[in-house]
A protein has these predicted regions:
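Aromatic-enriched
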Residues: 1-7, 102-103, 107-203
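Anionic-ligand anchoring segments at beta-strand to alpha-helix junctions in alpha/beta enzyme folds, i.e.
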Residues: 7-70, 74
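Fold-independent oxyanion-binding glycine-rich loops
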Residues: 14, 41-43, 59-60, 71, ...
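Short glycine/serine/threonine-rich phosphate/pyrophosphate-binding segments
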Residues: 19-23, 83-84, 206
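Short, solvent-exposed amphipathic alpha-helical segments in soluble enzyme
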Residues: 25-29, 90-92, 106
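Short, well-ordered alpha-helix to beta-strand connector turns
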Residues: 71, 92-93, 109
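ADP-ribose/adenylate-binding Rossmann-like module
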Residues: 86-104
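Conserved small/polar residues in nucleotide/adenosyl-binding loops
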Residues: 204-210
Length: 211
C-alpha cells in the first residue's frame, strides 16, 4: 500500500519555550522540501498552566487549510506534554522527549523515544530554548530530510549572528543523527531529499478561554 504523502507534527511544552517559533522553523523546512504547510498555534492562558502547543501539517499532494486530530510525531518539551498529547498520536506514532521526562504512560502502538536533550544544551552552554533545535533535528532525521536545507535556513534565520547560527546548526545536526537511527522504525511519510521550494504555507491561531 502506498504511504499517504502527508504528515503532522505537534510541538508542545511550557509557555515561553519557543513553541511557535519552532513550529514556523519546521514549517519552513517542510516548505523547502516542496510540501504544502499549515501551522496551527495555540496561545496559552497562564491561568490554565501556561501549556502551549503548535501543530505543523504538511502535504505533498494538496494545499492544506486545517490541522488534524491525530499526528505522526509529538515533540514534548516537558512531562505534562507527554501526558497531555499521547492520545493525539496515530497508531505507531512517536513521542520525542527528554530522558528525564520519559513516561510510563505509553500506550500500545506508541513509541516514546527519550534523549538527553537538556543535558546536551547544558554541556553546550546554550540557552534553554536551544533544546528546540535538537528536537527539530530529530524530527527531520526521522523523516529522512535534507540536512543542508535546515542548515541554510538557520544561516538565514540568524543572519549577522554567525555564532548563534553555528550553535543551532550544531545542535540540529546532533538531533538529526539521533533521528536517522529511528527513521526505519517510522512508518509514515518521509521527506523528499531535494530542495524544491514549490509549496504553500498557511497559519491559524487558537486562543482558548480562561475557564
Amino acid at each position: 500500500m502506498e504511504t499517504s504523502k502527508n504528515l503532522s507534527v505537534l510541538i508542545a511544552g511550557p509557555a515561553g519555550a519557543g513553541i511557535f517559533s519552532s513550529s514556523v522553523t519546521l514549517g519552513k523546512m517542510f516548505l523547502r522540501h516542496g510540501l504544502n504547510v499549515f501551522i496551527t498555534n495555540e496561545y496559552p492562558s497562564l491561568i490554565r498552566g501556561g501549556h502551549q502547543w503548535a501543530q505543523v501539517r504538511a502535504s505533498l499532494e494538496e494545499t492544506v487549510f486545517s490541522h488534524q486530530k491525530k499526528v505522526d510525531i509529538v515533540l514534548a518539551l516537558d512531562k505534562p506534554s507527554i501526558e497531555k498529547h499521547t492520545a493525539s498520536l496515530k497508531t505507531n506514532g512517536i513521542i520525542i522527549c527528554d530522558e528525564e521526562d520519559a513516561s510510563s504512560l505509553a500506550k500500545n502502538n506508541v513509541q516514546i523515544r527519550a534523549f538527553p536533550l537538556r543535558k546536551i544544551v547544558k554541556e553546550m552552554n546554550a540557552p534553554s530554548v536551544a533544546i528546540n533545535s535538537i528536537g527539530l533535528g530529530i524530527i527531520v532525521g526521522i523523516l529522512n530530510g535534507n540536512i543542508e536545507i535546515a542548515e541554510k535556513l538557520y544561516d538565514e534565520q540568524f543572519r549577522g549572528k554567525k555564532e548563534t547560527a553555528d550553535l543551532n546548526k550544531q545542535l540540529f545536526k546532533m538531533g538529526y543523527e539521533y533521528g536517522k537511527e529511528l527513521s526505519n522504525s517510522f512508518q509514515g511519510y518521509k521527506l523528499p531529499q531535494q530542495a524544491i521550494y514549490s509549496g504553500t504555507v498557511s497559519y491559524t491561531h487558537l486562543t482558548l478561554p480562561t475557564s
